[in-house]
Structures are given as structure tokens and as C-alpha cells.
């Protein structure tokens, strides 16, 4: 039997085994290059050297770190083990324990007169404090042990060892810093920088969202990642919590900006703009903000708007479906992972997916084996994942940002909305249809809000700072001559940029020229932000001026006031149409009681023969800036009057509001409600 017959026979035997009842042979990869992750994994295992086994003790690991340094302080044995230990040791033992072991080793070496080993330990401590200066402030005991170490060096070490403890040798390395800002235009320039949402180009909006995302991503530390993996929550990790809150805020901002438009065609224009923003984010490889924007567009409160989606072009619908498929959680985000593996240059990951990988790696194996030795491959795998994220933080973004536009976006994202409020707006725009409608083709990614509920309400100091920055930017661009005021037209367009514009938050009626000073604009923004961010939309009352025929007390004053009770022919006050709350004219801004809508009026349009509520006519300029000034309360389209949330009263006729259909006379309160108000 020659060689060919032998090969043929062996091939037939293998084929017979594979084709029979035995297990099929696994497919092999031939003539293909390994992935970068496979290469880094193999190189890391080679760098482990004598510790390439599955386990080692803490003392063995520490001894290997000491031997990395020579007499001149150079790393002659590589730095992989050293960096891995200094980064990952806090996952298995406190940093104070590691410092105490180093102090004990130094004292033992000094007793044995081993000056080289003493010098190596000093180099290790200096390297640790230089590359990880933040660890000293994280454990109270660590700083005391480090001080004891350098005190011991000053007493028992030579001149070379004592010089390493000098504060001038413990400088922390400078990081890449935040991405650069684009200088704002000077006052002498005639051209304004538009701070209007409709005037912002898709490229411009995507760049500024990427700037905010990268700045938030850069602030995340390894300690934040460790805290999340060990605790399973972002609580107690400020930078990580801020990054998650930013993503959730962007998602909800997209939803409310869509719902802020009154007509389906106008909402479709906002949808189309955000779809183009998402496409640009995909080109910039900013996948985290892409997840937030796409999640907002695919949210059920938005995807149910059938009348609005009808106005989208086929190209926009196709683009949204492609982005949704890219970020789908199917098969553990397989599509996104393939796309991410092929990306180069600047890129920002979906943070939730990569944190999920860290948790999976941590939970897969124990920290220590049954004999008490450390499970080294687990620490090394976690370290490699952390290094990938750290390398992304050292990137240089390809775009810059305008400070004024950042102030506009920052204040817009500060506003807080609950799921109930967003759904309330959605059903007000397009009420439920009794007929069965086909399901939406859009599938929202599961990880859109991967840390549910992490949308922190900004405190008053933060809101005040952001409002002050925005007002400064507004007057710099819209009052270049320095008159100290902006026109009513500019104010209308600016106020429509914010999501709270859809809740009827208008300023007091203007007289004369109608211009707004710096103080008035600041007061308006602070008041509107406080209502939306702290009190919530449920505190907005639909006040209407009425004449009380029976003695009635002001709910805000809590009794009679100097002008007497609210009754009589000339005693006029204000009553909320939804909950029946009464108050004086000058007290309607001080009402801090939640509007509890009566059950008989909630979602009930009334009998068929009843007169309908005031209904605003659609604006003539669909999608224009003037259309943005058309605002409504959450229940306008479902049967409630348009009202001001600034004064919490019905809107008065002014030049900057839509024309109103004449409203029928208000129905007098029933006898039961009158008795309850007495």
C-alpha cells in the first residue's frame, strides 16, 4: 500500500466517523490571521513569565513586581505584571494590606543589609504613587502606612533611597485632558452663532453630543468600574453614574423634543433630524450616544405615534431600522460586537455592553482557588478589558465644541421627566385609537437605559450655574451691541429650544417694546427649570379667572387676607379647571400643591353634546421657528385648555401665541364642589 492509498484510507475513516453516529468534527479556521484581542491575550500570557500558571500567592506576585526593577530603577523585565498588580490588587485585597507587606519586606531587607532589595522596593513604591496617585485618598489607612514607609526609609536607608521619597519625584503623569473647546465669536462680529434647535446642523449637533459623551467617558476611573462590578450598581461611583445619567438624559431629551411639536408633520421633521444625527454618530463611531438617541426614537411613547411616522420618508424609516438592528440585544449584541471589532481610530463604546462583559468575567471564576492562592488568569483577563477602556480614554477626538452650544445642551439635558409624564404627552398628541393598529416595526434596544432610574435631578446650585452660563451665551450672541436686552422674537425662538416649552411655560405678558433683560431671562429659565426638574409636571394647574358667589378661602394664603375672602360680585380669583383649587390672583405663582385631576374629568372628553374646549389652530409655518412657539399643556389635545405654567393661568391673547377659537362660558362649579371649597 503506497502513500496515496494510506491517505485515502485515513480520509475515508475520518469521513465515516463524521458522517456516522459520532460527533461531527468541528470546523477549523485555516489561513486566517488572529484577531487583535487574541494576539494581546497570547502576548499577555507570555509576559506573565514564571507566573503563567493558573495560580500564585500574594507574596509570589509581590516578589515578581519587586524584581522588575534594576539598580537604576529601569524595568528590565517588562511592565505587564507590575501594571496588572498595581491596577488589579484592590479587587482581591485592600491597598493598605499591599503597602503593609512592602513595609515589612523593606524592614526585613534592611535588617539583612540587602541594599539592592531595599532600593528596588523604594522604586516600586515610587512607581505606585506616581502612576496611581488617587489610591492614597481612597483608603484612610493607606496614607498612614505610606508615611511610615518613607519614615523608615529616612531612618534606615541610604542617600539614594531617601531621595526617592522626595515629593518632587512623586509627580503624577498628566493625562490627555478634556477635548478642546472652539472659541466663541467676539462681540464685534456681525454674524450670530445660532442657538436654535432648528438652525443647528446635523453635523454640529452630533459633534457636541460626542464632546459631552467623551468628556463624561474620560472621567470614569478603574475604581468606578471595580465598584460597579463588585456592587452591581452605579451608586457610589460618581463618574460612572454621571455617564449613565447623561445617556438616559439624552434619550429622554430626544423623546420630549419630538413630543414638543404640535402637528404630526412637525414631529416627523424632528424625528427625521434625529435620525440624521444618529447616522452621523454612527459615522463618528460614537456608539454610546447612538444607543441613547436610537433608544429615544424607538421608545414606545414615540413609536406609537403612527400619524407622525407616516410623514417619514422611506429612506429615514430604513435608516432607523438599520440602526435598531445594529444595536439590537439579539445574540448578546452580536451585530454591534462585530461592528466594534472592525472599528479603528476614534470610537466610543456602548458602555453598558462592556460593563456587562466585565461582570461576566468576574462572576465566571472565583478570586482564589480552594488552596487560597490567587486565580491569576482571572485577574489578567479583567486587566486586559480595563486596559482597552483606558486606551479609549486616551484618544484625541476629531471634533471640537462651541462653549455656547454646550451651555444650551447642558441646560436642556438637566431637565427631569418621568415615564408617566412622557407617556402623558404622547397620548395627548395622538390619543388611543379604538381600532387595532399593526405593531410598530421598531424594536427598542434593551440596553437603552441599562441602569434604570439613573436620571439624577440636578440640585438648585447646578441649575443656577447652568442657567447663568446659558444667559451669558445668549446675550453674547443675540445682544452684540450690549443694550442689555433681547427682543421678543429672539426670546420666542430661544424658549422653544427647551423641552419644557411643550408644557406651556411662558413668561408674564409683556408691555411696550416687549424686550427681555438679562435678569428677566434668568428668572424665567430658573423658574421653568425648577418646575420641570424638581416639582414635576403634575404641579402645573390650569387656573382660570372666575367670580366666587360664596365665601371661599385662598389655598395658598390658608385663610382670609387683608382684601377679604374670595366672594362677592367684585371678588374675583382663580380656580384650577382640573382639581378645583382656588387662590388669589397674586398667589397663583406660590401654589405648591400637586394638581390632582378629578376622576370624572380625567381622560373623559365629556358627553357628545357638551361644548368642546378651546382648540388652537395649527400654525401656518409647519416646522418653522415660529411653529416652535406653539406650545401646549400635556392635556391640551385630550380636552384641556391651553394655559400658562409661568403664571399657571389661561393664556391671554398676545402677539406671540396662536390664535384661539372662542371658548364657551365656564360652567359654574357644582353644589358639592362649592361646599367643599368653603
Swiss-Prot record:
<dbReference type="GO" id="GO:0009898">
    <property type="term" value="C:cytoplasmic side of plasma membrane"/>
</dbReference>
<keyword id="KW-0862">Zinc</keyword>
<dbReference type="GO" id="GO:0002717">
    <property type="term" value="P:positive regulation of natural killer cell mediated immunity"/>
</dbReference>
<dbReference type="GO" id="GO:0005509">
    <property type="term" value="F:calcium ion binding"/>
</dbReference>
<dbReference type="InterPro" id="IPR000651">
    <property type="entry name" value="Ras-like_Gua-exchang_fac_N"/>
</dbReference>
<feature type="domain" description="Ras-GEF">
    <location>
        <begin position="201"/>
        <end position="432"/>
    </location>
</feature>
<dbReference type="GO" id="GO:0007265">
    <property type="term" value="P:Ras protein signal transduction"/>
</dbReference>
<feature type="region of interest" description="Disordered">
    <location>
        <begin position="1"/>
        <end position="33"/>
    </location>
</feature>
<dbReference type="GO" id="GO:0007200">
    <property type="term" value="P:phospholipase C-activating G protein-coupled receptor signaling pathway"/>
</dbReference>
<protein>
    <recommendedName>
        <fullName>RAS guanyl-releasing protein 4</fullName>
    </recommendedName>
</protein>
<keyword id="KW-0479">Metal-binding</keyword>
<dbReference type="InterPro" id="IPR002048">
    <property type="entry name" value="EF_hand_dom"/>
</dbReference>
<feature type="compositionally biased region" description="Basic residues">
    <location>
        <begin position="20"/>
        <end position="32"/>
    </location>
</feature>
<dbReference type="InterPro" id="IPR002219">
    <property type="entry name" value="PE/DAG-bd"/>
</dbReference>
<dbReference type="GO" id="GO:0005886">
    <property type="term" value="C:plasma membrane"/>
</dbReference>
<feature type="domain" description="N-terminal Ras-GEF">
    <location>
        <begin position="49"/>
        <end position="175"/>
    </location>
</feature>
<keyword id="KW-1003">Cell membrane</keyword>
<dbReference type="Pfam" id="PF00130">
    <property type="entry name" value="C1_1"/>
</dbReference>
<dbReference type="InterPro" id="IPR036964">
    <property type="entry name" value="RASGEF_cat_dom_sf"/>
</dbReference>
<dbReference type="GO" id="GO:0016020">
    <property type="term" value="C:membrane"/>
</dbReference>
<feature type="region of interest" description="Disordered">
    <location>
        <begin position="165"/>
        <end position="185"/>
    </location>
</feature>
<feature type="compositionally biased region" description="Pro residues">
    <location>
        <begin position="605"/>
        <end position="619"/>
    </location>
</feature>
<dbReference type="InterPro" id="IPR001895">
    <property type="entry name" value="RASGEF_cat_dom"/>
</dbReference>
<feature type="compositionally biased region" description="Basic residues">
    <location>
        <begin position="1"/>
        <end position="10"/>
    </location>
</feature>
<dbReference type="GO" id="GO:0019992">
    <property type="term" value="F:diacylglycerol binding"/>
</dbReference>
<feature type="region of interest" description="Disordered">
    <location>
        <begin position="598"/>
        <end position="620"/>
    </location>
</feature>
<feature type="region of interest" description="Disordered">
    <location>
        <begin position="651"/>
        <end position="678"/>
    </location>
</feature>
<dbReference type="GO" id="GO:0030154">
    <property type="term" value="P:cell differentiation"/>
</dbReference>
<dbReference type="GO" id="GO:0008270">
    <property type="term" value="F:zinc ion binding"/>
</dbReference>
<dbReference type="InterPro" id="IPR008937">
    <property type="entry name" value="Ras-like_GEF"/>
</dbReference>
<keyword id="KW-0446">Lipid-binding</keyword>
<keyword id="KW-0863">Zinc-finger</keyword>
<dbReference type="InterPro" id="IPR023578">
    <property type="entry name" value="Ras_GEF_dom_sf"/>
</dbReference>
<feature type="zinc finger region" description="Phorbol-ester/DAG-type">
    <location>
        <begin position="540"/>
        <end position="595"/>
    </location>
</feature>
<dbReference type="GO" id="GO:0140367">
    <property type="term" value="P:antibacterial innate immune response"/>
</dbReference>
<feature type="domain" description="EF-hand">
    <location>
        <begin position="466"/>
        <end position="501"/>
    </location>
</feature>
<keyword id="KW-0472">Membrane</keyword>
<keyword id="KW-0106">Calcium</keyword>
<dbReference type="GO" id="GO:0005829">
    <property type="term" value="C:cytosol"/>
</dbReference>
<dbReference type="Pfam" id="PF00617">
    <property type="entry name" value="RasGEF"/>
</dbReference>
<dbReference type="InterPro" id="IPR046349">
    <property type="entry name" value="C1-like_sf"/>
</dbReference>
<keyword id="KW-0344">Guanine-nucleotide releasing factor</keyword>
